């Protein structure tokens, strides 16, 4: 089976980390996010991934020049202009002939880290004779997502994009993993922006051809600072991951943190509940709490980062400075 992975967005929610690279090339523990996605797809029987590219496509082509990512074959489809989610699917599918194939294909959001069993999704798709089948996952607050109520047979009854929390009919949301028949590509209009969530799926609901599978599998949308941080802390805990090539002073405190290779933590410094990128220096007495620091940065002596502050690559935080819930540099300029 083949899969289209949507990785063309600008990653604005993760700025300043994404000012110079796509979010799917940001590290998650010891490898880029896209390798977690490709590895999961390969483990579920996908033998070829088509990356739908837009923002900084060279980051992917240079990282995987041999066309392999986590053991899965890659093909590239670079959009000349962003045409939203459905437009990206149409472009990628046509670029590699998925719209003319005689079998369904997968579509996956490239910032989702999950262990969903794709075989169950494909089985429901075939059993129901669906045109498209989507995975659903439960969340506490569905207001940031597409909420999807379904009938007893899995047929989707409505597709409600980002409802008010108080008015959401359920907490089962679109998990960003779809099985699509080639006919879906023909539903996507040419020459303009088209959202699969706001336009294509609601039309399929009206036609009765959209189905969904509810799944309690582990699932994280890693596209925000809070979730990008939490997924790494959870994966480190779950897998027993340990940092390598770091220098931590014996008097420093490092708890529930992810330190990338080359990180240095000085005397009396504290790093807790945080992610620190490669070659970053945490100087003596500094505190990094519940925050993210990019690569090659310096957190000055006695400074404090907390409240989910995000510090970009190669930034120098002056000694004694206190950042609370701040972005440095400010993406807004």
Per-segment meaning from a language model:
Residues 55, 133-150:
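Short beta-strand-to-loop element that shapes/binds the nucleotide-sugar donor at the catalytic cleft/hinge
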Residues 25, 147-150, 201, 212:
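A structural signal for short hydrophobic beta-strand segments in well-ordered beta-sheet cores
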Residues 8, 54, 110, 137-138, ...:
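Histidine-centered beta-alpha loop that forms part of the nucleotide-sugar donor binding/catalytic region
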Residues 242-333:
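Structural signal for interior beta-strand "rungs" in well-ordered beta-sheet cores
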Residues 1-5, 13, 27-113, 118-120, ...:
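Conserved N-terminal catalytic core of the sugar/cofactor nucleotidyltransferase
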Residues 104-106, 113, 119-126, 139-142, ...:
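Catalytic-core segments of class I nucleotidyltransferases/pyrophosphorylases
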Residues 25, 76-77, 159, 212:
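Generic preference for hydrophobic
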């Amino acid at each position: 089976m083949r899969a289209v992975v949507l990785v063309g967005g600008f990653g604005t929610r993760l700025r300043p980390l994404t000012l110079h690279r796509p979010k799917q090339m940001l590290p998650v523990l010891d490898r880029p996010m896209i390798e977690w996605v490709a590895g999961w797809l390969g483990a579920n029987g996908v033998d070829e991934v088509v990356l739908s590219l837009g923002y900084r496509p060279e980051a992917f082509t240079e990282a995987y020049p041999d066309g392999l990512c986590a053991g899965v074959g890659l093909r590239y489809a670079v959009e000349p202009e962003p045409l939203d989610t459905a437009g990206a699917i149409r472009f990628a599918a046509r670029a590699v002939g998925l719209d003319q194939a005689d079998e369904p294909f997968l579509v996956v959001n490239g910032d989702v880290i999950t262990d969903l069993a794709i075989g169950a999704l494909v089985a429901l798709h075939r059993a129901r004779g669906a045109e498209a089948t989507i995975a659903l996952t439960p969340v506490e607050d569905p207001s940031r997502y597409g909420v999807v109520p379904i009938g007893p047979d899995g047929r989707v009854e409505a597709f409600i994009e980002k409802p008010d929390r108080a008015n959401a009919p359920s907490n089962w949301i679109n998990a960003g993993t779809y099985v699509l028949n080639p006919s879906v590509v023909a539903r996507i209009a040419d020459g303009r922006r088209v959202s699969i969530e706001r336009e294509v799926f609601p039309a399929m609901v009206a036609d009765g051809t959209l189905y969904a599978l509810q799944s309690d599998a582990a699932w994280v949308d890693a596209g925000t600072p809070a979730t990008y941080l939490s997924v790494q802390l959870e994966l480190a805990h779950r897998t027993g991951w340990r940092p390598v090539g770091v220098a931590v002073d014996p008097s420093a405190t490092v708890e529930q943190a992810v330190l990338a290779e080359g990180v240095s933590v000085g005397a009396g410094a504290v790093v807790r509940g945080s992610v620190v990128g490669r070659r970053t220096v945490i100087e003596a007495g500094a505190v990094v709490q519940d925050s993210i620091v990019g690569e090659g940065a310096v957190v000055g002596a006695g400074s404090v980062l907390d409240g989910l502050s995000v510090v970009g690559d190669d930034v120098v935080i002056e000694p004694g400075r206190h950042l609370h819930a701040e972005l440095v540099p400010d993406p807004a300029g």
